Structure formats: C-alpha cells, structure tokens
Amino acid sequence: MSNKEDILKKYRSNIHERFEMPDLSDITPITYKEPLSQFIEMSKNVGGNIIEVKENQDINALVKELYPDAKEIASNLSEITIATRNPDTIENAQALNGTDVGIIRGMLGVAENGCIWIPQQMKEKAVCFISENIVILL
C-alpha cells in the first residue's frame, strides 16, 4: 500500500459519522440574459475597466495608447511584442519590481461578480500583484 493510500485509510477510519449528499435539485442557478453585459457591469462595480477589443485591433498599440508613460511592461504572451520583461525568463520575482503594466491571460470571466480565473501560466506569478497596472486578456 502506498503512503497516500495509508493516509487515506487512516483518514477514513476516523470518520465517525457519514452523511448523504444533499439534494441540490431545488437550487436554481443564477442565469443572465446577457452574461457579457452583466460581467462588464459587475467588473466596473468592483473597480475594473473593461475594453472590448475589435477583431483586428492590435493589442500592443492599444496598451501603448492606454498606458503611454509605461516603460516596463511584463508579459509572457507570444502576441505581446512590447514586453520589456518576461516573467518566465527572469531570475526571481524581485526582478519584476518596477513593472508599470503586466499583461496576462484570463481563462474564464464570472458574470455574477466580475471575477476572472487566472491560472498560473507563468514562472513568476508576482507579475499579477507587483505590476502598477494589470491587463487581463480574456
């Protein structure tokens, strides 16, 4: 038996009372007629600024337009050609200090609260926190 199996066996043997899963059929999920509009509204309510990029619009030019004074831009996304730092190739997280704009990719926007799921797809996730401004491509 593996160490994991030993741990799980000990854990299961110490469960004194077992409960059935509750019936969730009475719960009605929240739905929105216009989920994108709801996401944009909620994001603005919590301090975000949503910009819908047109199909052929250059993201690099848009970032330069939005942040004209930005000198240090960090991103590991292949479509971002204006990045001066790559969070995958720096020696340590401290090297991201002084980043004006961090550009990352979000995977899922939540209409209910304007949150965005951002998986760690970079070596140094500090870019998400240390940047003065963050651009999330969704």
Predicted features along the sequence, with ranges:
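The feature marks the mature, well-folded catalytic cores of soluble enzymes
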Residues: 1-138
